[in-house]
């Protein structure tokens, strides 16, 4: 996990300590829910509410993921490109905070894969779902 630029030992220790044994989660989606980062809609009847994160879950885990965003986006080119993609995409661009939540969820998926499957961090595999012209990681 230290191979990911912008992620330090304190972040890793907090991420591992807060949820406990990562292997008890069947998917990274469960960790996102555990952290309270899953989207919920506030709607009633014909009223269509806006989407937001639920905030039901581990507050400290959310805080750890939020605090790692500044150094991660400053030092890690791949995560910065994912963030920029979410903010500037033509169809459904996200606001800055929404993009940070999306990148946090991506980081959870990377952490989960490294810790449960025993794979190494691979920036090309991580970027495979983002298709953007002029990307520095063109496949």
Residue ranges, per PLM feature:
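Low-complexity, acidic/Ser/Thr- and charged residue-rich accessory regions of DNA metabolism proteins
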Residues: 46-47, 83-139
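Phosphate-backbone recognition surface of nucleic-acid-processing proteins
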Residues: 2-5, 9-92, 96
């Amino acid at each position: 996990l230290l191979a990911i630029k912008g992620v330090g030992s304190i972040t890793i220790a907090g991420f591992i300590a807060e949820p406990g044994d990562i292997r008890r989660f069947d998917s990274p989606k469960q960790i996102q829910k555990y952290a309270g980062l899953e989207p919920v809609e506030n709607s009633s009847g014909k009223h269509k509410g806006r989407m937001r994160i639920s905030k039901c879950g581990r507050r400290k885990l959310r805080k750890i993921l939020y605090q790692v965003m500044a150094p991660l986006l400053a030092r890690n080119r791949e995560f910065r490109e994912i963030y920029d993609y979410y903010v500037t995409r033509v169809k459904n661009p996200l606001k800055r905070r929404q993009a940070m939540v999306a990148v946090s969820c991506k980081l959870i998926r990377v952490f989960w894969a490294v810790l449960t499957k025993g794979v190494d961090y691979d920036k090309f595999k991580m970027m495979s779902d983002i298709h953007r012209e002029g990307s520095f990681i063109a496949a």
